[in-house]
Each structure stands twice: as structure tokens, then as C-alpha cells.
Amino acid sequence: MWSDVVEYIKAHSCRWSFEPDEGEWGIHQLDDPPHNRLLGPVFARGPAAGVIAIDGEIQSQWGDIHRADMTFSVTKSYLAMVAGVAVAQGLITDIDQPVSDCLEQRGILSHGFEDAHNRPISWRHLLQFTSEWSGQCFGVPDQIDHYRNVSMQPSASTKRKGEKRPLKNPGTYWEYNDVRINQFSLALMRLFDRELPAVFAEHIMRPLGASDTWHWHGYENSYIESNGRQLQSVPGGGHWGGGMVMSAHDQLLLGQLMVNEGVHNGQQLLPEHWIEQMQTPCDIAPWYGFFTWLNTNHVVSPSLPEESYFAMGIGGQLIWHDPVRNIVAVMRWIDSDFTGDILGVAGGEVKG
């Protein structure tokens, strides 16, 4: 079983160079100057790799599943997990509460949420990419991702990426925007008053028994001062470098945590209701949950079950979760032009 999927992936792997190349790696080169440069580190990659498990048992694997590689926007799903830790600890009691109110109630300055447009923005708005947050985060303006198109959104803008777009009210417009997720990450770090990689390690990765090869990098300028300490904020992807570097095997553990509704070895690491909310369709963008792609109306893959959900990143990073059949498939460095075909072959395996 799954041999057809593995063979198809091997025949359609990412065509990027193995060493970082400004001409093809990342998204930053598509940005308008002066923001078309790296702010964080990038790392050489390995060949295509991946692993497929059912009920936590590995069914098939290929490549080096223990090599830690950049995950790009798959990082967003891990940032949503860290937000789940904040919910579990009572730091966030209402995801519909404005971020500014949540921070200020705890005596934390609500940097970036002070003005009339940004004050009503809630945690939910940020998690669903409907915030319309406006400003600069570590020197990069939200405008840089205005009119941005990503491959899995159902409709595409005909405007030029980075062209100034009239802002809507928070919660009324969906846009995939890496500046806004970085602002979310910064607000979450302020709430914990700890660097998020430390939170992720303590509450998720170590309890899962993950390796110590993963690392989550910030930017050269993403430090803030808090109570006399320097804390580095981390991004939700690799748009300007940085982000999560992790092995396919560790990603499998995280995927299994998701399909097991936040439970690992009898321990509830993330609230079950949080896992459910991550998979709940956004009212105005039903293909998206909390930093998670959904197969609502089979918009991502006609071949896979509708309850499937995904974490995705450029360079052919894809994690497919099927919570009904308890399937987790981690695919690294596939040719993104063939993502639909690869998922189609996987769908054939599910249907048997």
C-alpha cells in the first residue's frame, strides 16, 4: 500500500537547488525593494523525503526522514499550536477578544494595536488571516503582501502583489499575509513573556518525545526588550528567511498529535476544542481554519475526503491529515506543480 504515492513523489520532486539560491528560494525576491532581502538565516536542503502513518504506525517512508530542513509556511500550523498552549494556560480566555484588550488587561503594552483601525482586531481575526492589520512589523509593512495570491486559494487577484489596497474592517476580508502572522507571533510572545520556541519545546516537543534537531529562527532585527531581557520573536514562515527547521519524523509526531485531538500517550497536550477550532472553516474563507488549509467542498483536493486538512509551504512542503482514518502524510520537497496529482494518487489509496 502507498507504493504508487511514493513512486509518484520520487518522480516529481522539487526542482530547487540544494544550496540556497536567491533566484529560486523563498518569496522575498518577489517583494518590492527594499524588502526583497533576507532578514533571517536559510539553510541548504536535502532530497525529497516523507513518511505516511496510519494509527501512528508508519506505513511507508522515503528519503531521510530524520534530516531537519526548512518548513516554510508549515510553521504557521505550529504557531497555531503555540496559541493553543496560551488558551490551555488561560492566557487567552476568549479568541474573539481584541488583542489590545487581552494584552492591556495583563499590563502589557499593546504595541501595534493602538490605533482605531487595529484596536478591534481579535485573536481569531489574526488566526484566520482576516485581521486587516495595518502597520510595520520589524520594518516590513503589511502592504508588501497586499493582493498576494497563493496556490490553494480558490480565487486569485489580478492586481500586482504589493500594490496598496484599501483596507476593510477586521473580519471582513481574507488575505494571506506574512507580515500579519509575524505581528501575531510578536503579540503571542508578549503574552507569554517568553520566546515562543521555548514554549513550543516545553509544552509540545519534549512531551512528544521529539528529537533535538529542530530549531526556530527569528530575524536579525526581531528582538524586543522585556523586563530587562532581550527576547527574539520568530516568524510564521520563511518569507524573509528564518522560521522552523524540522525533520519529517518530528512533523509526523505533530501531525499525529493533531489527528489524536491533542492527546499523546494519554496526556492532553493541547485542548481538544482547540484542535477542533483549528479545523473549523472561517466564515468568509471556508477553505481556511486557524493557520490551516481545509478541504471544505474539496477545494484543495477533489480526490481526498472533505474532512482532510493540510499544512503547506513553498518548496513542496505538505502535511495531509485525515482525522477520520487517522492518516498523517508528511511530504517534503515535492514538485508543487504536481501537488494536485500527488494528492489524487493518495486519494486512490484511501478509496482502496
Residue ranges of model-derived segments:
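N-terminal leader/targeting segments and the immediately adjacent pre-domain N-terminus
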Residues: 1-65, 72, 89-93, 190, ...
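Short active-site loop at a secondary-structure junction
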Residues: 38-51, 61-102, 106, 117, ...
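Active-site SXXK
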Residues: 56, 70-95, 126, 184-188, ...
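Short, well-structured active-site flanking segments
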Residues: 59-61, 86-106, 192-218, 265-272
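Active-site-proximal alpha-helical segments within enzyme catalytic domains
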Residues: 77, 180-187, 240-264, 317-333
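Active-site-proximal binding-pocket segments
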Residues: 200-201, 205-279
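Active-site Gly/Thr loop motif
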Residues: 217, 222-238, 242, 246, ...
